[in-house]
Every structure is written in structure tokens, then in C-alpha cells.
Amino acid sequence: MKRILVIGCPGAGKTYFSKKLKEITGLPVVHMDNLYWNEDKTSISFDELNKKLLPYLKEEEWIVDGNYHDTLKLRLEYATDVFFLKMPREQCIEGILERIDQPRDDIPWIETKKDAVELIEWTIDYEARTKADEEALLKEYPDIKVHIIKSRKGADTYLEKLKKRFHR
């Protein structure tokens, strides 16, 4: 495990999981939201995002946290492992609501109730819009180890096993 992608629906716990992976493995984390979004909530183009992302991907070791389907193929070209957090929709919505008005280091602003409503709408449509494409794309890279995590408990269990493996 040297170059890790953590993907999944908003609110699935990607950032939490990525930070825990960093604690265990010592790998640096790149948050896609910090690359894509500006402090004023405007975003850059996906071409610009790919250009900003590429130097990180060329590094020997990393954890990249975030979805951004339009950049997934590029990220998969470099990844050794993918953690796909397939949490139940209700848990994802809960995760979104829990971070309202909370300072975070993975996004350049504090999310408001309005932001949460937009993310919840996106989350409700996630499976129909994105999930199948992501699963199909992952199959194009048989050498990448894909770890499917379907619950918060499953995530915690995996992280505990990894701690033992890394003697932490």
C-alpha cells in the first residue's frame, strides 16, 4: 500500500478514514476538495484540477481523499489501492449533517446548512449517477487492490487490523 485512493459518496467518511490511514501508515494525504475549491466557494476546471493533482500522483507514496469522477481515471493510473466507502445513504446524510459549522482542514471553508442541503441532494442521486461508472472503471484496473467498506464498523475494524500490521 503506497498510493491509496479513498472514494465514496459525500458523508461516507472518506476524510476521517484517510486521516486514520495517515496515522497508521505515515503516508501524506491530499484532499481533492482543497485542490478543487477556492475559499469563496468557486471551483477550478477539471483540466486545472488534473494539472494540480498530477505532481502529487507522481510521488512514490500518498493517500488521495475524494471523488471527482472526472479525475478518477487519471488517479487510477497511479494508484496501488482503492478504498471504496459504500456506506448506506442514511449514514452518509448523517455524516454531512454532523459537519455543519465545523472547521475542517479538508475543504477551504466551513460548511453551512445550505451547503449540507446541496450535498444531501447530490448524495441522494449518487448511486444512480456515479456509483456504477466508478465500479466499471475500477474493473479496468485489475492490478489495483480494491477494498470495499460498507459500514462505519467495517471501516474501524479494517483500521484496527491495519494498526496491528503496521505495529502502531
Residue map of PLM features:
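Walker A/P-loop
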Residues: 15
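Walker A (P-loop) ATP-phosphate-binding motif of ABC ATPase nucleotide-binding domains
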Residues: 3
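Hydrophobic anchor at the beta1->P-loop junction of P-loop NTPases
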Residues: 6
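A glycine- and Lys/Arg-enriched "phosphate-lid" helix/loop adjacent to the NTP-binding pocket
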Residues: 87-130
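The conserved Walker
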Residues: 10
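Conserved nucleotide-sensing/catalytic segment adjacent to the nucleotide-binding pocket
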Residues: 28-82
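NTP-dependent small-molecule kinase module
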Residues: 125-168
